[in-house]
Each structure stands twice: as structure tokens, then as C-alpha cells.
UniProtKB/Swiss-Prot annotation:
The keyword tRNA-binding applies. The gene is rplE. Belongs to the universal ribosomal protein uL5 family. One of its GO terms (biological process) is translation. Keywords: Ribonucleoprotein, Ribosomal protein, RNA-binding, rRNA-binding, tRNA-binding. It holds the Pfam family Ribosomal_L5_C. Part of the 50S ribosomal subunit; part of the 5S rRNA/L5/L18/L25 subcomplex. Contacts the 5S rRNA and the P site tRNA. Forms a bridge to the 30S subunit in the 70S ribosome. This is Large ribosomal subunit protein uL5. This is one of the proteins that bind and probably mediate the attachment of the 5S RNA into the large ribosomal subunit, where it forms part of the central protuberance. In the 70S ribosome it contacts protein S13 of the 30S subunit (bridge B1b), connecting the 2 subunits; this bridge is implicated in subunit movement. Contacts the P site tRNA; the 5S rRNA and some of its associated proteins might help stabilize positioning of ribosome-bound tRNAs. One of its GO terms (cellular component) is ribosome. The keyword Acetylation does not apply. It comes from Aeromonas salmonicida (strain A449). SUPFAM superfamilies: RL5-like. GO terms for molecular function: rRNA binding; structural constituent of ribosome; tRNA binding.
Amino acid sequence: MAKLHDYYKSDVVNELAKQFGYKTIMQVPRIEKITLNMGVGEAISDKKLLENAAADMAAISGQKPLITKARKSVAGFKIREGYPIGCKVTLRGERMWEFLERLICISVPRIRDFRGLNAKAFDGRGNYSMGVREQIIFPEIDYDKVDRVRGLDITITTSANTDEEGRALLAAFNFPFRK
């Protein structure tokens, strides 16, 4: 079991229950899933780029990504409905906790010119979204084998009802929020 999951069960649950006055531990917010998304717009002209992006995503997440397809045709972007234009991975359970641990402890500190994550990137329902400009911050990606530097979106979906609860949950995991 991931250390972060043990820490959540032993310390964070009690801390948040006390802070927000929950009657049962089932009311305490928890992380439900982490979604990684990589849009590869250049895949229209070169299919190899999407394969490389999917391989990077598989290395980062530890599971095979789902290839996302265009929902409708857009002439301005030269895409048709059904064209593969990106990939995504949804992490739950043990893989989710392991990824979150790697993200907080290893990857986020490796971001260039890092001054903390934006504390206002919550969606109003306690879910947090962040963008990463370079996939090379993850230790699983070998810098020499990267064909192109790509970014990805990371969404942490929680069971929190408000942004305040979600922020308290992530802050309990020592998320490096900007002051």
C-alpha cells in the first residue's frame, strides 16, 4: 500500500473530521480519481506523434492510455470527426495513490522556475486541475528518448463539496500551494 494512502487513513481523516466537524469518517473528503490528459494536435499530420505521446503517458501513469478522438469536425483546425487527437488515463485505487506520491515528492519539485501551485485552480466543487508544460519532469521519462516536449493536464477529483474542503485535503498531503 502506498505511504500516502496509509497517511491519509491514519492522520488526514481524523484531522479533517476535526477541522470541519464531520460526524462520521465517511463524510471526510477523499481523492476519488486522478485523470491525466494529453492533447496532441499535431497528430493530424503525423500519426507517430500520437504513438509517442501514448507511450510517454503509459510510462508516466503505469497503464495504457485511451486514445481520444475529435467529437466534431473543425475546418479551421483541419480535423474531422473521429480523428485521433490525444490520449487520457484515469487512475484509481493503488495506482492513483502511487502516482500522487510521485507527483508531490518528485515531479512537482522538478518543474522549472517552480514557485508553488496555483491555489485558485479549484472548480467550485473541490476538484483541482493543473497543467504541466513538460512531460520530462516525471522520472519515468528518459530525456534522451523524448522526440518532442509535450504538456499534460492533471485533474484530481475529490469527494469534497466545496473548494475549501478540497484545498484542506490536498494541503494535508503537503501539496506545494503558492502562498
